[in-house]
Amino acid sequence: MKALAKLRPEEGIWMVDSPTPELGHNDIMIKIRKSAICGTDVHIYNWDEWSQKTIPVPMVVGHEYVGEIVAIGQEVNGFHIGDRVSGEGHITCGYCRNCRAGRRHLCRNAIGVGVNRPGSFAEYLVIPAYNAFRIPDNISDELAAIFDPFGNAVHTALSFDLVGEDVLIAGAGPIGMMAAAVCRHVGARNVVITDVNAYRLDLARKMGATRAVNVAEERLADVMIELGMTEGFDIGLEMSGAPSAFRAMLKAMNHGGRIAMLGIPHEPMSIDWGEVIFKGLFIKGIYGREMFETWYKMSALIQSGLDLSPIITHRFHIDEFQKGFDAMRSGQSGKVILNWDER
């Protein structure tokens, strides 16, 4: 089958002819319709320090997708040939304390599709049936293909009550922008997103941010005055992984504020712990999606009118995957979709 793989420990992704994955008793086989390129895939393409420590080479990569079930293992119940599905990219052990308590997103033994085992940049993907999520008929293939990153945004944004709250989002990447859309949709008052990328800040405005702030050109404190804010932000969503952005967020938070952190710093960072202690801030780390409550919330948000369409900015056939990676690496894109249909 046709697939995109990391073949060598160097920059790049390559189109290969790969064996079709074998189906286990508890697995489903998915014929991929559309894939999306994740920031993780860009890290793997660039072969940065994280990738070098994490990715076994060769490896078929990718974990954002939608497709159709074409084969079902003999022990699988609840799915049928022809079902349209996406899937949870973290495959959990099922026997650790968190798994047995229903907190599978905190599994200490999780492995990643397209990271530790063959992924979805391929004509066919095999995953445990447990990991599959059936897509409602009134949700498009394109939106279903980005459920994985959308789930990160939903998990982060819905960590705290947002109704009537002032929200600060650090980082206008695709996940940060989708989080802004979620916050506005569920009733936040002001949703302010910060970055230094003018293209993505403009896209964040289209996604519903009250104010998109280029922190290289204007002060966050001035924006707060402009919005009539006198006590700081109630909710912070850290999506950037940038130490300077997190420090600025701590300063801008109201006493008793709550912060959800999804962004991963590239190296250890220092902060003023006095900001946390004396303000009584609550900080929550976010990893992946809650299985499968986040997935149900994603569907419900879209079905209730949440518009994510502006986030998809580029579409290419899978044979043009290099153009897709070039767009993602340029920073001048939202989500990039790769189509697997016949030309």
Swiss-Prot record:
Its EC number is 1.1.1.103. NAD(+) binds at I175, D195, R200, L262, G263, I264, I286, Y287. Its cofactor is Zn(2+). Pathway: Amino-acid degradation; L-threonine degradation via oxydo-reductase pathway; glycine from L-threonine: step 1/2. It is an enzyme of class 1 (oxidoreductase). It is found in: Cytoplasm. The active site is at T40 (charge relay system), H43 (charge relay system). InterPro entries: ADH-like_C, ADH-like_N, ADH_Zn_CS, GroES-like_sf, L-Threonine_3-DHase, NAD(P)-bd_dom_sf, PKS_ER, Zn_alcohol_dh. Pfam families: ADH_N (PF08240), ADH_zinc_N (PF00107). One of its GO terms (molecular function) is zinc ion binding. Disulfide bonds: none annotated. Binds 2 Zn(2+) ions per subunit. Zn(2+) 2 binds at C93, C96, C99, C107. GO terms for biological process: L-threonine catabolic process to glycine. It catalyses: L-threonine + NAD(+) = (2S)-2-amino-3-oxobutanoate + NADH + H(+). The record marks D148 as: Important for catalytic activity for the proton relay mechanism but does not participate directly in the coordination of zinc atom. Transmembrane segments: none annotated. Keywords: Cytoplasm, Metal-binding, NAD, Oxidoreductase, Zinc. HAMAP family: Thr_dehydrog. Belongs to the zinc-containing alcohol dehydrogenase family. Homotetramer. Catalyzes the NAD(+)-dependent oxidation of L-threonine to 2-amino-3-ketobutyrate. PANTHER family: L-THREONINE 3-DEHYDROGENASE. This is L-threonine 3-dehydrogenase.
